[in-house]
């Protein structure tokens, strides 16, 4: 057999790769995602708890201890009130508290308000530190501006 033809066939994947004459061709392993099975198992366990869907929930925010927030936009929520169980479906995003501040203030509890105060204090201290650096920069910039000539008033010339 021609070597070039053999290389083309190997590149296509139509040639046996193995030890000897009677070995079968290599099978490609298919990896199946099991998200469907997990979802079915979750649905059956929620059905056992007799959950009811809750409509008209626009967003869900879960506050973590490190100050970040897990934000669900337009989630599906199911609840079983007797067993105090809630299931939230949707794509959750990790966000910082500062990203959600304007619309989230009415949802904050006492713990979250304390973390918001700490965040505001740290933000103010960062601004003061940056402001101190800017003041130094302003002093350096003043060297480039020439002083006014004595005896001349530029405001009179503008009017």
UniProtKB/Swiss-Prot annotation:
Residues 36-101 form the NAC-A/B domain. Part of the nascent polypeptide-associated complex (NAC), consisting of EGD2 and EGD1. NAC associates with ribosomes via EGD1. Belongs to the NAC-beta family. Its main location: cytoplasm. Component of the nascent polypeptide-associated complex (NAC), a dynamic component of the ribosomal exit tunnel, protecting the emerging polypeptides from interaction with other cytoplasmic proteins to ensure appropriate nascent protein targeting. The NAC complex also promotes mitochondrial protein import by enhancing productive ribosome interactions with the outer mitochondrial membrane and blocks the inappropriate interaction of ribosomes translating non-secretory nascent polypeptides with translocation sites in the membrane of the endoplasmic reticulum. This is Nascent polypeptide-associated complex subunit beta. InterPro entries: BTF3, NAC_A/B_dom_sf, Nas_poly-pep-assoc_cplx_dom. It comes from Botryotinia fuckeliana (strain B05.10). Residues 136-153 have a biased composition (Acidic residues). Residues 23-32 have a biased composition (Basic residues). Gene3D superfamilies: Nascent polypeptide-associated complex domain. One of its GO terms (biological process) is protein transport. CDD domains: NAC_BTF3 (cd22055). GO terms for cellular component: cytoplasm; nucleus. Keywords: Cytoplasm, Nucleus, Protein transport, Repressor, Transcription, Transcription regulation, Transport. Residues 1-39, 121-159 are annotated as: Disordered. It is found in: Cytoplasm; Nucleus.
């Amino acid at each position: 057999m021609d070597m070039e033809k053999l290389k083309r066939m190997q590149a296509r994947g139509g040639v046996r790769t193995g030890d000897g004459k009677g070995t079968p061709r290599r099978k490609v392993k298919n990896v199946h995602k099991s998200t469907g099975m997990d979802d079915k198992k979750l649905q059956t366990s929620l059905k056992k708890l007799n959950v009811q869907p809750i409509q008209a929930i626009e967003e869900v925010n879960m506050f973590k201890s490190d100050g970040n927030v897990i934000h669900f936009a337009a989630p599906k929520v199911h609840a079983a009130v007797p067993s105090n169980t809630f299931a939230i479906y949707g794509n959750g995003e990790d966000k910082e508290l500062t990203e959600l501040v304007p619309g989230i203030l009415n949802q904050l509890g006492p713990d979250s308000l304390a973390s918001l105060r700490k965040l505001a204090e740290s933000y103010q201290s960062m601004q003061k530190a940056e402001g101190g650096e800017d003041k130094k920069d302003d002093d350096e910039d003043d060297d480039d501006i020439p002083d006014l000539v004595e005896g001349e008033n530029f405001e009179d010339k503008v009017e």
